[in-house]
A protein has these predicted regions:
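Conserved A3 ("GATE") glycine/threonine-rich loop of ANL adenylate-forming enzymes
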Residues: 66-67, 125-135, 239
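Generic non-transmembrane alpha-helical segments
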Residues: 2-10, 47, 51-55, 111, ...
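Short, hydrophobic/aliphatic alpha-helical segments
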Residues: 45-58, 112-129, 216-237, 363-367, ...
């Protein structure tokens, strides 16, 4: 009743068919929401969250193409952002972009392409995944690593807390507003900040987040930022919707590197492949994608592109798909020289060739991008694939 009064009948649905349609996601879980809200208004979301809090009902947000372990499910109030909240606004000549949570990676990058820019995060499901999920999961992808992920490229954010409080971190008065509206939250954030900055804890947090890590909350925010609103906005990244709703975000973009050098490095064992990583990283490689023997065999079985995967020298082989992204031909030539120097010292099945030919590198990336579907497709009828990021 509160939701209907606040939002109106056109935005709130109790229809069993609508609720059943959004009940499943790509996980093995099934929860049917009690109410479905579809709106493109931050104030509507704030009203919905405040009403849910008054009635002690859970609220969840549905985006697309993100985590696959039931994060998009609820038996309470579901707010579906995929039909609305799709705004994209280019700022500062493409160096920044304001995005809403219903916009997909592909849609944003297609707008940024004319400026020679793109978003830092590049998850494989970029056609379907929306910025709401990318930010809430701290998605990275194949080339951004820890340097250009969602956390590192966030400039500012508008978020809605469970109480209905709306904070815009681009507003110079945001710290005062947060302190006025949420004094207990601010006190808690400051206490946690001080605890995290104790030497032993700070050293552990620094170590954990010096590598790719999306487990739990981003506690590095307590070390990287000093004020409550900035800390909270960066805790939102990777929080999977548990801290609030991300209504929009301004993201710093990265330059598109037009000169590429790609190679598939084939190793006799998985151990040999992993031992090669430090030298490759030191050489400045942008992308390193590992494929084990099972993955390689599935790729070999592909009727279109399987021929590009070399035959297995025995059981347990592995491969690294590596790629250098460079701003010009000179730096590309230098990268290829560095790559050849490293690979000449590696335990490889055959000598690799670095290429920028789309006819060669395209099929390799097609196989890699479609690898999850191939692996999941081998399961028996009635089985469900369970997967989640563990790093």
């Amino acid at each position: 009743t509160d939701l209907l009064a606040a939002l109106g009948e056109t935005k709130v649905s109790h229809d069993p068919l609508n609720l059943a349609a959004v009940a499943p996601d790509a996980s093995h879980y099934l929860l049917t929401p009690g109410v479905l809200v579809r709106t493109g208004s931050t104030s509507d979301v704030a009203a919905a969250m405040a009403a849910a809090k008054r009635h002690n009902v859970a609220v969840n947000f549905r985006s697309g193409g993100t985590s696959l372990s039931g994060q998009g499910l609820t038996n309470g109030v579901m707010v579906d952002t995929r039909r609305s909240f799709r705004g994209i606004e280019v700022l500062d000549g493409g160096r920044k972009v304001r995005v809403q949570p219903g916009a997909t990676i592909v849609a944003v990058n297609s707008v940024l392409a004319r400026y020679g820019r793109k978003l830092g995060p590049d998850p494989a499901s970029s056609v379907a995944c929306t910025l709401g999920g990318v930010l809430a999961d701290n998605s990275s992808g194949m080339s951004c690593g820890t340097v250009a992920n969602s956390y590192r490229t966030l400039d500012s954010m508008i978020f809605v807390l469970a109480s209905g409080t709306v904070i815009d971190t681009a507003d110079p008065q945001c710290e005062d507003k947060l302190a006025h509206d949420e004094p207990e939250l601010v006190e808690t954030l400051m206490a946690l900040r001080d605890q995290c900055r104790e030497q032993a804890r700070a050293d552990e947090i620094t170590f954990q987040f010096s590598r790719k890590n999306t487990m739990g909350y981003g506690l590095n925010a307590f070390l990287d930022y000093d004020t409550p609103a900035q800390i909270l906005s960066h805790l939102m990244i990777g929080s999977e919707g548990t801290l609030g709703f991300i209504s929009s975000a301004v993201m710093n973009t990265v330059k598109i590197m037009p000169n590429l050098a790609t190679a598939l490095l084939h190793f006799p064992t998985l151990d040999a492949a992993t031992k090669a990583l430090p030298a490759l990283v030191k050489s400045g490689v942008t992308v390193t994608e590992l494929m084990d023997s099972s993955s390689l065999q599935l790729c070999r079985d592909d009727p279109v592109n399987g021929h590009i995967i070399p035959p297995a020298p025995g059981s347990g082989d592995a491969a690294l798909l590596v790629e250098y992204h460079c701003p010009d031909r000179k730096s590309r030539n230098e990268a290829v020289a560095a790559g050849n120097s490293v690979t000449s010292e590696l335990d490889l099945v055959n000598k690799p060739t670095f290429t920028d030919d789309p006819a060669v590198r395209g099929p390799i990336w097609t196989l890699r991008s479609g690898l999850y579907a191939k692996v999941a497709g081998t399961r028996q009828s009635g089985q469900t694939a369970l997967l989640e990021d563990i790093a």
